[in-house]
Regions:
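Residues that mark the N-terminal boundary/hinge immediately upstream of a DNA-recognition element
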Residues: 10, 19-21, 45-48, 59
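Short, charged recognition helix plus adjacent turn
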Residues: 65-101
Length: 101
């Protein structure tokens, strides 16, 4: 699950696809910071990732899915199915761990 390099690529891909310059993020980030993210020199916090995605008008999970699955719709479908299964399993485990009154 190596997505660190892919996150940089996904960020740049979405930014360019949306026709946004690095300067378009000036309300949430400097152009220099955007450049360091896109060159994989730094990793954003979850909060910063959400702010960047808001500028690009996408959900952070969309960006992360692109980072993990790349351009493959099949890989994206498999990843999203895995996430759904894991969320269901966590919910069942949480419910099973609740004390009964």
């Amino acid at each position: 699950m190596a997505a660190k390099n892919s996150l940089a690529k996904a960020l740049k891909t979405v930014r360019k696809a949306r026709g946004l310059s690095q300067e378009a993020f000036s309300d949430v980030s400097s152009r220099t910071y955007m450049s360091t993210l896109e060159r994989n020199l730094k990793s954003p916090t979850l909060h910063k990732l959400a702010e960047l995605c808001e500028v690009m008008k996408i959900h952070p999970l969309t960006l992360l899915t692109l980072a993990y699955a790349g351009d493959s719709p099949r890989k994206a479908d498999e990843l999203l199915a895995q996430v759904r299964r894991e969320l269901e399993a966590v919910a069942k485990e949480r419910d099973a761990a609740k004390p009964r009154a």
